[in-house]
């Protein structure tokens, strides 16, 4: 390990805005399987990590924290939490938040598989998935797969939105398929964010009727793609855009967690950390969201391109 990383890890310990729990703080038991247990911060983020109580917006796989930092500046009436497992990446965002005395930004270093151990039902208003790994060979490792969506809706407020922004056409199409398979409400969907209006829209404004339900606590969404979706760019987005990849964007709602799924939140069985990602509990075992069973096979029959590509050329299904 390089001296630079060691220095960042040491400085991470000094940042009050960065929470770095040890694995045994959220895992109980021995052997191949572990039981997930609640962390003390669960239900207490507003009182323990921020300078004032506000609706909480979560970014999963935040990397260097560019989205969290920029959104926090644009929306001071909301609290933002960036989650990632890489401490060297989190250092940049935590450093910037600390230097600029940003009281509405926090970071959490943990595996996203453990995310429900940190948030109480209704504690999070909105979720962003920005340029996460498409996990071409492991469906259950995709952050927008039914198994992860079941975890999110245990703590996402009623009417809460999930934003997916990615250079991977594969992940975008897969997530669309998940939404359609489960009749999830799609608010915006564009396969080329910087060159087109949202699919099913005119001049960038959605034609879908209806307004936000009263239970929604996130920043107002009036049927248009928010300016920050295009204006805020992560390190990876900038890199992929320069390489010619199209950026896709999808926004959808999750229904509230069913009673049986919520009740299982305190007794979730987690796989051994050394086990393959797709050896996890299957979606039907933890909730009611279904996987688009034939999507992967159909996709690769429809698209020319190597399986190892991070992103794929544009295509029509």
Model regions: which residues?
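SAM/dcSAM-binding transferase cores
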Residues: 1-52, 190-266, 272, 278-317
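Class I SAM-dependent methyltransferase "Motif I" SAM/SAH-binding loop
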Residues: 61-65
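A short acidic, Gly/Pro-enriched loop at the edge of an enzyme's catalytic core
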Residues: 118-126, 131
């Amino acid at each position: 390990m390089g001296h630079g990383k060691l220095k960042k890890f040491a400085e991470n310990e000094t940042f009050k805005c960065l929470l770095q729990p040890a694995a045994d703080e959220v895992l109980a038991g021995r052997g191949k399987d572990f039981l997930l247990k609640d962390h003390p911060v669960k239900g207490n983020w507003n009182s323990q990590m921020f300078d004032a109580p506000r609706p909480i917006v979560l970014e999963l796989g935040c990397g260097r924290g560019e989205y969290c930092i920029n959104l926090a500046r644009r929306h001071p009436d909301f609290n933002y939490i960036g989650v990632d497992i890489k401490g060297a990446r989190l250092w940049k965002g935590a450093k910037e938040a600390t230097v600029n005395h940003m009281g509405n930004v926090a970071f959490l270093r943990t595996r996203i598989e453990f995310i429900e151990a940190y948030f109480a039902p209704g504690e999070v208003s909105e979720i962003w998935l920005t340029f996460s790994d498409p996990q071409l060979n492991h469906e259950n490792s995709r952050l927008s797969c039914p198994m992860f969506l079941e975890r999110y809706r245990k703590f996402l407020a009623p009417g809460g939105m999930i934003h997916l922004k990615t250079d991977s056409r594969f992940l975008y199409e897969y997530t669309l398929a998940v939404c359609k398979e489960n009749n999830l409400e799609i608010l915006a969907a564009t396969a080329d964010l910087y060159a087109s209006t949202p699919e099913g829209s005119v001049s960038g404004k959605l034609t879908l009727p209806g307004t936000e339900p009263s239970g929604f606590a996130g920043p107002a969404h009036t049927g248009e793609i928010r300016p920050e979706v295009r204006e805020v760019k992560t390190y990876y987005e900038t890199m992929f855009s320069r390489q010619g990849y199209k950026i896709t964007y999808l926004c959808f709602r999750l229904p509230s967690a069913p009673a049986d799924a919520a009740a299982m939140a305190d007794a979730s069985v987690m796989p051994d950390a050394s086990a393959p990602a797709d050896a996890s509990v299957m979606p039907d075992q933890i909730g009611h969201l279904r996987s688009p069973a034939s999507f992967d096979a159909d996709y690769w029959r429809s698209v020319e391109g190597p399986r190892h590509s991070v992103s794929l050329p544009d295509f029509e299904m």
